[in-house]
UniProtKB/Swiss-Prot annotation:
Family the entry assigns: Belongs to the prokaryotic AdoMetDC family. Type 1 subfamily.
Record keywords, A-Z: Autocatalytic cleavage, Decarboxylase, Lyase, Polyamine biosynthesis, Pyruvate, S-adenosyl-L-methionine, Schiff base, Spermidine biosynthesis, Zymogen
PANTHER family, per the entry: S-ADENOSYLMETHIONINE DECARBOXYLASE PROENZYME (PTHR33866:SF2)
Protein name from the UniProt record: S-adenosylmethionine decarboxylase proenzyme
Essential cofactor(s): pyruvate
High-level lineage: Bacteria, Pseudomonadati, Aquificota, Aquificia, Aquificales
Modification comment: Is synthesized initially as an inactive proenzyme. Formation of the active enzyme involves a self-maturation process in which the active site pyruvoyl group is generated from an internal serine residue via an autocatalytic post-translational modification. Two non-identical subunits are generated from the proenzyme in this reaction, and the pyruvate is formed at the N-terminus of the alpha chain, which is derived from the carboxyl end of the proenzyme.
Name of encoding gene: speH
GO cellular component entries: cytosol
Active site residues of this protein: 64, 69, 84
Entry note: cofactor: Binds 1 pyruvoyl group covalently per subunit.
Presence of keyword S-adenosyl-L-methionine: yes
Modified residues (Pyruvic acid (Ser)): 64
Length: 133
């Protein structure tokens, strides 16, 4: 039996309104809103304003990270959401971003990361047998 340690969503968003992705304050608010909406835990963040247009930013999470890089002059934003906090939280963070940015087109890749074996817990009988050997 195996389990996946994390889920990674890479999304290219096209047809995003210029004003939604041009300013670093809006980009910061977007990612922080996604973190809160998904119930993720922020460790730190870094954001940068480009001139004449665009912004980039990343929030480091206890569960991994969420990032954005924008080209508002092309109506384009590259989004990266990777968490080990459960698939639901990863999808919720992306759902929030899509609701706010309302892209006309989305190209998305979803990857399960870190598939590892799951060891079953020994039953009570197996524990007794191991202790008496």
């Amino acid at each position: 039996m195996e389990k996946t340690l994390g889920l990674h969503i890479l999304a290219d968003l096209y047809g995003v309104e210029f004003d939604k992705i041009d300013h670093v304050e809006d980009v910061r608010e977007l990612l922080e809103g996604a973190v809160k909406y998904a119930g993720l835990s922020k460790l730190s963040s870094h954001f940068h304003q480009f001139y004449p247009h665009g912004a980039t930013g990343v929030i480091l999470l206890e569960e991994s990270h969420i990032s954005i890089h924008t080209w508002p002059e092309h109506g384009y934003a590259a989004i990266d959401v990777y968490t080990c906090g459960g698939k639901e939280k990863t999808f919720k963070a992306m759902e929030y971003i899509l609701k706010v940015l309302k892209p006309k087109r989305i190209d998305e890749k979803v990857a399960e990361r870190g598939t590892v074996p799951v060891h079953k817990e020994a039953t009570h009988i197996e524990k007794i047998e191991l202790e008496t050997v």
